[in-house]
Amino acid sequence: MREPLALVLGEDDIRALVPHPAWDTNKYARGTVGVVGGSAAYPGAPVLAASAAARCGAGYVRLVTTSGATACAHAHLLSIPVSACDQGIWGTLCATSAIQAAQDLAKSDVILVGPGMGTSDDSERFLEALSQDRPMVFDADALTLIARNHGLLDMPARHPRILTPHEGEAARLLGRKIANRNEDALQLARDYEATVVLKGPETLVATPLG
């Protein structure tokens, strides 16, 4: 395996990566994003994520959350459709709601799962039942669930996936404290067959190849 190559990206580099759609591009051609999360305790987390997806240029964003969290979503998301799914006794998504979620996310090119979804047993069963049949982004509580049960991720990976841990979540995924951010981000990428975005004062992005 070749040695990892490290690059430092500045504002100009990031700006060059932002796509500029043609004037006649429709919303579906600009990419569709499904956001899954939220619970009775954290109804606002997926709202922030869905808003961010829209602001980043996604043509169509849909939020899938619990029935108890929809009021918060409707109050803050004026142009993003919100789907309500069954919730378990802890006020989180549950295994039966995965079927509803799959139907609502059928047109999504990529799915972000995790913000505010909680770490209850119901949350774990939901994540286990959620199909990983397209590119996926795992964030927040989804990472804690994966650290607790590595079997929640399809292995080998069938589609591209991204993990977005902060150092605490990264430590849980590794099963030890972070010793070297560069090396540990690469280790995570290889262990989980994913692109890893290790957040911090200087965010690191690592792939299994470097």
Which residues are covered by each model-predicted region?
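Small-residue (G/A/S/T)-rich helix-start motifs and N-terminal tracts that mark the onset
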Residues: 1-135, 144-162, 167, 171-210
